[in-house]
Amino acid sequence: MLQLKIVSPERIEFTGEVESVKVPGTQGNFEILKDHAPLISTLTKGVVEYDGQQLPILGGFIEVQKNMVSLCVERQV
């Protein structure tokens, strides 16, 4: 399992355990699974998907380290 935390300027959007996270990277969509290599990347407009949930975003950043995934995003309203 992954520990996922998604924050926006307004609030904490989600925190909890998930199987995987799909994100809209600036070089294309990609998926984070358990034991993924450490990573820092920018995100572009699109949809973050995790455990059947979808969160539309305008952009942001992702950090992956030791099965902990942190996203700092600007929400699309």
Q: What do these predicted ranges mean?
A:
Residues L2-V77:
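Compact, glycine-rich, soluble single-domain proteins
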